[in-house]
Each structure stands twice: as structure tokens, then as C-alpha cells.
Amino acid sequence: MATLHRQNAAGRRKVQVSYVIRDEVEKYNRNGVNALQLDPALNRLFTAGRDSIIRIWSVNQHKQDPYIASMEHHTDWVNDIILCCNGKTLISASSDTTVKVWNAHKGFCMSTLRTHKDYVKALAYAKDKELVASAGLDRQIFLWDVNTLTALTASNNTVTTSSLSGNKDSIYSLAMNQTGTVIISGSTEKVLRVWDPRTCAKLMKLKGHTDNVKSLLLNRDGTQCLSGSSDGTIRLWSLGQQRCIATYRVHDEGVWALQVNEAFTHIYSGGRDRKIYCTDLRNPDMRVLICEEKAPVLRMELDRSADPPQSIWVSTTKSFVNKWSLKAMHNFRASGDYDNDCSAPLTPLCTQPEQVIKGGTSIVQCHILNDKRHILTKDTNNSVAFWDVLKACKGEDLGKVDFDEEVKKRFKMVYVPNWFSVDLKTGMLTITLDESDCFAAWVAAKDAGFTSPDGSDPKLNLGGLLLQALLEFWPRTHINPMEEEENELNHVNGEQESRIQKGNGYFQVPPHTPVIFGEAGGRTLFRLLCRDSGGETESMLLNETVPQWVIDITVDKNMPKFNKIPFYLQPHSSSGAKTLKKDRLSASDMLQVRKVMEHVYEKIINLDTESQATSSSANDKPGEQEKEEDVSVMAEEKIELMCLDQVLDPNMDLRTVKHFIWKSGGDLTIHYRQKST
């Protein structure tokens, strides 16, 4: 399903095109999991990934494969999710600046809210009122009526929202009580700000933390609040007294995640130190170390299907999600066998999780090879892979080889200008094309491994070819060579479709490839799958979103001009020849040194008078190819070219000479001399 941010084209910032190289079905979390929501009625767990994907899992332990489905629409980290309407609706918040409304049972996106101007980091939910709040780095808090959101349609797509102002810094945490009478935000301002969401009135500001407030919880009636901070403390606040009434120093490092039981008497905490504790709020010395994760804890979700809770789900910066049993803790608590010495190290009650939702690997390192087409990557499992940027696919799994050695092994003395950028934020390869350099790279078809139908070796623009492949299914990009009258006839004969030219004629990208149009600042305007661009709705939205620089290439077929490189050609000092007038020459940066040698041979050295005399008319005579080959062979036998006294390989092109040998600013200077016989 496509998403679009409608906006006046004149007011739009520069638009980039991105795409993700990935499998059609990404079954496993590729990166850390930022948020969890449990639906005990359906035995389903929702995970919100840093790979931009929300996944649904069965928590039925008898099921061998827990994966149910993926919910894909976001283009950046999903930072928070909330289940509403008794599990029928899911709300998500993302670093792509959007809040999305999903049908949780069927797994599709119903609507997208684009009110935020920066990363959306936190959501809060008032269950009794079906009210949701969203907040993020733009310092804004917006209130949403869930029943209104779920009623949105293509024609009825206007929604009003209330906003809470007053935050001075980026918001990282949010909490609202079930009855929707109090809402609290935590931020890098290190204070808690409190509002009444019914009137949007500011109620108070609570000071005490010395670092970012990462997690917040409110009791049912909105009289008490728990906060976890990067300063390593958990604080209990009385809103009636407008002050902190208890501070819990349980963790060695920042506290990033909190859960509390229904009675608001026991708090579960986790964070940077990877440990998960349960602390009795009435007696802080009664703390239990439940378990220790293998990575910093990002989120926890209590299984509230029983009271007291029998298990807790935990996600971390790694891709695995673990379910830890709390039964041993309840038995331990009943025994009263606490270690009241808070300075003494505690032994975890659980050493193995009760259930594990396995995760996948995340790409953590990459190297763009010199051909500016292939990329080497290393993932969290230390496995190395070889990727084809142009065809948007993995070329080869190389296994656990030495990454640096593999880079050295694949080095070629060839220079191609940069024409794309790579991002690994989601754990997958995201390639971005920008108008400023997308068309910088030209290559010969044969060098790129492509053959032309007519046997020629045309010059190909990599960025142009890729854009044509990404939008191959968009009808507006198709070429129909027939005249209108013939079109009508062919349509009747059923031949029209076969005559339409699609794509670039050389290669295709996988049809499931996500294509993203976004502002340079990161805001997504439109996301769709490559294969869906032929749909009526998607095609219409593409008309409104695709920038002119992409239209020029894909629709109008106006390929950019070749890159020119200026250079000087002079006799080498060892040749004894008189230095020529310093004329500034210019040629395509892909011109091979061999062609410059031919120029020197024919025009300057003048070894073959006949060749020189006929060179101007050679193109019009039979045997042109044979004569060109003769000249090339003679030139290589008689002439050598040098740059900074290094003899040049005839197969090199000018841009490679400039990049690897000349290496400095100013115009390239090439010297020539006759080979000694």
C-alpha cells in the first residue's frame, strides 16, 4: 500500500529517491526492537523494529514457527506502538515523522498522520477514553481520538487534533492514565511536564532528574508517576504534592524501560546495564534480579493475563525478543528471602528465557567498491556478503571471511564517480539517489557486463538506468512507438502490450523492492513497492510526487550529458621534442588512454603520413574498423603516455588517471614519448 504526504510542490524541499535491498519477506527482526505490545486474547505479540517493520508473532509455545505477518509502511525506526480498541487497532510512531493507524487483526495500514515535523519517539494511551497522545523530537504533543482515526477514509481524511505546548526540548517518553485526566512528558530538559489533556492546560513541572527521562508510568487515577532516567535512577512522584517522594537506585547505568503491576506496588526496570529488576515500591530493599540480558534493554511488556503476572517479554538492542518467567520471583518473594544489602551483587533468578523469538542479522559495516556498483558488507554475525546496487540484490554470501582482506582482493584500478549514498540505520542496505550526483557515473556497457542488441558498446549512465528500473511498472514511463491510429488497431489485435517498451532494456530490479521518495531532511513523501507503481492510485500519486529530475530521465528519456575532463598533452622531457603550445584539450572522462595514444600517433608524431592524410575521411570508407584497429595497434607499439612519470595502461580511462595518479587539483597533464626501439 502506498503512502503520500500531500504538499504544495513549490514549497517542497529537494526530493531524493531511496530504495531498500532486501528479501521479499523479512521474517525476522533485523535490528534492535524498540517497542512491544501483547494481545493476550489472541496470544499475539507485536514487535516494533529498528528495521522499520512491525511484526506479529504467535506466543503459543506449541507453535514451531511463531511468525505470523509483517506490517510494513514505515521507512525508518518504529519507536513505539500502542494496541487500542481491545486489540483491533494498532498505533505506531516512527522516526520517519509519521504516526500510523493499523488494522491489527488484518495487518494493514488504514491511515497516516503527518502532523509531527521530526522523529516521533513516544505514544501514550488512555484506555477508558480511547485517546492516544504522540510526541517526539519536535517538542510537540498531539492528542488523537482513536475512534475518529479508525473512521478515516480516502474521501473523509480530515482529522482535528489538540496539541500540548510548552516543552523546551526533545520528548523521549510519554504517559497518560487510563481515564485520560493526566498526561506527562519526559525529555532531555530533565524535567517532567504535566498537563490535563481534557483542557490542554499545564498543571506542573517536576524537577529532580539530572539526565534524559526515558520512561514514564502513571497509576490509574493519575495521582502518582514513576520515571526512569539515563541518570540511572527511578523516581516516584506525587502529583498532589508536586514533588518526588522516593528515589530508587537499582541500576548501575541508565534506566530505559519500566513496567508496573496493576496495583502499582512493584516496578520492573531495565536499561543500559542489561539487568532486569523487580523492586517493591514500599520497601526498596526488597529487590529481585530477575535476569540479565545480552544487550541493553529497550522495552519490556508484562503478560497481564494472570495476576500476579507470570512472565515478562523483553526486547533489547539485539534482534532477539525473550520471554522471562516470573514464577520463581513470586516464590522467592513469598519466602521472604531477600538480600537487603543493596551493595552486594545479586544472582539472577532466571538464567534462560522461557521462550525466544529469534532475530536476524543486521548489516553493521559496508564498503563501496571502486566500480561504484558493488558493495561488501559485514553483519552482526561477522558474515560478509557481496551486493549489486544496480540490480538491487545480493550477489553472493561469502561467509565469515576477513572483511578487510576481501576489500583488498576486490580492489580494481578503476575510478567511477560517486553517484549514490548508503545508509545502514535499519540494518539493511538503503541506497539514496540525489539530484546533485545521481547522474555522475557513466560506464561502457561491456564494462558493466551488458550487451547491446546491435552489438555496439554504448555508454550507460548508472543512475539513469537504475531510476528507469525502479519505475519500470509506472505506465507514464512506457514508450509506445506506434502512431495513434496504429495503436487503436494494435489494441484491437491484442498486440499493443507487446510493443510497449518498459524499463531500461538491460536489467530489472526485484519487483518487491521498496521505493521511497523523501525530502533531503528525511521526511518521507511517498513509499511504494516497485511492482505497485502500475496501480491506478499509485500511478496518480507518483504523478504528484516524482521530482522533475527523475521525470526527465524516466518519462522524457532525456539522458544527462557526458562528463568532460580538461587536460593538457605535452611531449615528455626525455623525448627531446620541442614543447608544444599549451592547448587545453577536453574529452569524455571515460576516454581510454588508448584513444589518446592514437591521437598522438596520428596528429602529433606523424609517423604514418598516409594515416594522417586519410584520417579525416576514414569514417566514410569501407574497412573503417580494420583501419581503426591498425592505428590502435601501431600507436601502442610506438607510443607511450605518462602521468607524473608513471607509464599509463592503455585500458585506463582519463578519470582513473586523474583520480589514482594525478591526484591533485588543476587540469590533468599527460606526457607522451616514442618507445625506444
UniProtKB/Swiss-Prot annotation:
<keyword id="KW-0963">Cytoplasm</keyword>
<dbReference type="InterPro" id="IPR019775">
    <property type="entry name" value="WD40_repeat_CS"/>
</dbReference>
<keyword id="KW-0238">DNA-binding</keyword>
<dbReference type="GO" id="GO:0006974">
    <property type="term" value="P:DNA damage response"/>
</dbReference>
<keyword id="KW-0234">DNA repair</keyword>
<keyword id="KW-0853">WD repeat</keyword>
<dbReference type="GO" id="GO:0005770">
    <property type="term" value="C:late endosome"/>
</dbReference>
<keyword id="KW-0677">Repeat</keyword>
<dbReference type="GO" id="GO:0000724">
    <property type="term" value="P:double-strand break repair via homologous recombination"/>
</dbReference>
<keyword id="KW-0227">DNA damage</keyword>
<dbReference type="InterPro" id="IPR036322">
    <property type="entry name" value="WD40_repeat_dom_sf"/>
</dbReference>
<feature type="repeat" description="WD 7">
    <location>
        <begin position="292"/>
        <end position="334"/>
    </location>
</feature>
<dbReference type="GO" id="GO:0043130">
    <property type="term" value="F:ubiquitin binding"/>
</dbReference>
<protein>
    <recommendedName>
        <fullName>WD repeat-containing protein 48</fullName>
    </recommendedName>
</protein>
<feature type="region of interest" description="Disordered">
    <location>
        <begin position="611"/>
        <end position="632"/>
    </location>
</feature>
<dbReference type="InterPro" id="IPR020472">
    <property type="entry name" value="G-protein_beta_WD-40_rep"/>
</dbReference>
<dbReference type="GO" id="GO:0003677">
    <property type="term" value="F:DNA binding"/>
</dbReference>
<feature type="repeat" description="WD 5">
    <location>
        <begin position="208"/>
        <end position="247"/>
    </location>
</feature>
<comment type="function">
    <text>Regulator of deubiquitinating complexes, which acts as a strong activator of usp1, usp12 and usp46. Enhances the usp1-mediated deubiquitination of fancd2; usp1 being almost inactive by itself. Activates deubiquitination by increasing the catalytic turnover without increasing the affinity of deubiquitinating enzymes for the substrate. Also activates deubiquitinating activity of complexes containing usp12. Together with rad51ap1, promotes DNA repair by stimulating rad51-mediated homologous recombination. Binds single-stranded DNA (ssDNA) and double-stranded DNA (dsDNA).</text>
</comment>
<feature type="repeat" description="WD 2">
    <location>
        <begin position="73"/>
        <end position="112"/>
    </location>
</feature>
<dbReference type="GO" id="GO:0003697">
    <property type="term" value="F:single-stranded DNA binding"/>
</dbReference>
<dbReference type="Pfam" id="PF00400">
    <property type="entry name" value="WD40"/>
</dbReference>
<dbReference type="Pfam" id="PF11816">
    <property type="entry name" value="DUF3337"/>
</dbReference>
<dbReference type="GO" id="GO:1905168">
    <property type="term" value="P:positive regulation of double-strand break repair via homologous recombination"/>
</dbReference>
<dbReference type="InterPro" id="IPR001680">
    <property type="entry name" value="WD40_rpt"/>
</dbReference>
<dbReference type="GO" id="GO:0003690">
    <property type="term" value="F:double-stranded DNA binding"/>
</dbReference>
<dbReference type="InterPro" id="IPR051246">
    <property type="entry name" value="WDR48"/>
</dbReference>
<comment type="similarity">
    <text>Belongs to the WD repeat WDR48 family.</text>
</comment>
<dbReference type="InterPro" id="IPR021772">
    <property type="entry name" value="WDR48/Bun107"/>
</dbReference>
<feature type="repeat" description="WD 1">
    <location>
        <begin position="28"/>
        <end position="67"/>
    </location>
</feature>
<feature type="repeat" description="WD 8">
    <location>
        <begin position="358"/>
        <end position="397"/>
    </location>
</feature>
<keyword id="KW-0833">Ubl conjugation pathway</keyword>
<feature type="repeat" description="WD 4">
    <location>
        <begin position="166"/>
        <end position="205"/>
    </location>
</feature>
<feature type="repeat" description="WD 3">
    <location>
        <begin position="115"/>
        <end position="154"/>
    </location>
</feature>
<feature type="repeat" description="WD 6">
    <location>
        <begin position="250"/>
        <end position="289"/>
    </location>
</feature>
<keyword id="KW-0458">Lysosome</keyword>
<dbReference type="GO" id="GO:0005634">
    <property type="term" value="C:nucleus"/>
</dbReference>
<dbReference type="InterPro" id="IPR015943">
    <property type="entry name" value="WD40/YVTN_repeat-like_dom_sf"/>
</dbReference>
<keyword id="KW-0967">Endosome</keyword>
<dbReference type="GO" id="GO:0035800">
    <property type="term" value="F:deubiquitinase activator activity"/>
</dbReference>
<dbReference type="GO" id="GO:0005764">
    <property type="term" value="C:lysosome"/>
</dbReference>
<keyword id="KW-0539">Nucleus</keyword>
